[in-house]
Amino acid sequence: MSKIQTINDVLNDIRQKATTEKEKGTEFERLMKRWFLTDPRYENLEKVWLWEEFPGKGDLGGSDLGIDLVAKDDTGDYWAIQCKCYAENATIDKAAVDSFLANSSRQFLDDETMQTRQFSNLIFVSTTRNGWGQNALKATQGLEKPFTRINLFELESSSVNWGKLYKGEEGKKALKSGKQPRAHQLQAMSKAHHHFIEEGNDRGKLIMACGTGKTFTALRIMEEMTDDKSLVLFLVPSIALLGQTLNAWMSDKSEPMRAICVCSDAKATRKMKGEDDDDESVVDLAVPATTNVKSILRQIKVAEREKKRTVIMSTYQSIDVVSDALHQAGKYVDLCICDEAHRTTGVKIKDRDESNFTKVHSDEYIPARKRLYMTATPRLYKESIKIKAKENDDILCSMDDENIYGKEFYRLSFNKAVQSGLLTDYKVLVLTVNERDLPYTVSEKIKKRSQAVKKEDLLKELNFDDATKLIGCINGLSKRIKGDGGSTVEEDPVKMRRAVAFCQTINPTKANPNASSTQMANYFEE
């Protein structure tokens, strides 16, 4: 067991030692109980029971009917948790969740208050890489209670020491050691203190290149500028970024903090015709999210009672809920942090509804004592656009407007980050491929496949445009470009070892992996 360091090491050991499926499942449930009592994201859990330990199990039928763990948080809410130790590539089907959903909707008696209770949050933990069947996904949609699914990725990215946890330890002694700020982050922290505290400015811009640790720097700035009575608002443009920030801040914090996630699928992933039918979802956040104002206010009160900073992490799309909560409570935000702040630019047109992304600038809408805008790519507008907006009596939010965004107190450019050794140097290779350059076999296969599938499924198929781009990627990776006379590989003969491809939408990411190896073979055959 001394060599066990990762969750995968633990799972392999459990599978090897278990003589039955029941034994494997029981060991995994015990591990997950310790995990929930250790991972910083679940600090608000006061108790976690194995099913056989739960006092209210008799009211729910007594026997194991899908609920493996029960947790109680510091607001008095109960969580139903199912734990599945499946193979990494397994798919969660509807049968795996049906009994859990059915039994977690039943009532039970709270043995402390002697009141009838229901579960408020539903958590499904599995050791798969998010392999959920369509029917299982549909069964978890539209539920009245928050449903959260935790997969292998979340377990792998947890800040716990899996070796210690597997040995039976839990709590702070089973956590990994935290991060320490690097020189450029310390400089940014010092500049922030000077700008906001010493000079007394209420707005300011932090510009840092991608990959240099903006999120961690913002955490340390927040901890220096606020105390245990403070209320902080952190805004992001997507659920995925909210999840990343939640994980990073709860893992790296050096002082007590309570995170409240505010977002919903309906608000953060509004679908337009022609867009993907599959997107990031609140069910993939590590902790339950809410858009219920009463729930938000209740959590704020608990944090105040426990003398913890309250950090509301919200998408810009759910800013209306945050505004309602602040006004109902009569509270000010001590520090509002706007991540990806370039998204908050744009024109506020007179007599039209304002974008959720620009509402954050208003003190009336979001009462905040200080605002920190951070981005790697500040967005500015040309003078002609500014003049036109002024002529139309519109308000233009441009990041060079210090009345809205404040002064820039720290900048770390991509160039400086590369020179400092913080980022790897890079080159830009522009790949130009025409549809005429597609090999005949490739174009014919795409054409036949497109004719064979249903019209509604065409978006999920690899089309000519995607195939052309894919050929461009193959050219760049292989350096075997037709017609260049071998100049590309001569200039840069070192083989490509790894590549990451970014797609504008999700559907091509599903089609491309299956198509790339086939198209590569067809391409080089010709």
Where do the PLM segments sit?
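ATP-dependent helicase/translocase motor core
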Residues: 3-19, 23, 35, 41-42, ...
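Interdomain helical connector at the RecA1-RecA2 junction of SF1/SF2 helicase-like NTPases
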Residues: 383-525
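Conserved helicase ATPase motor motifs in RecA-like P-loop NTPase domains
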Residues: 209-211, 342-343, 362-389, 421
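Active-site beta-strand-loop-beta-strand hairpin of nuclease catalytic cores
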Residues: 62, 70-81
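Conserved Walker A/P-loop ATP-binding site and its immediately adjacent core
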Residues: 230-254, 259-272, 318, 505-507, ...
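Conserved helix/coil segment N-terminal to the catalytic DExD/H
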Residues: 296-332
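SF2 helicase catalytic motif II
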Residues: 328-373
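Conserved motor-coupling elements within RecA-like helicase/translocase cores
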Residues: 275-310
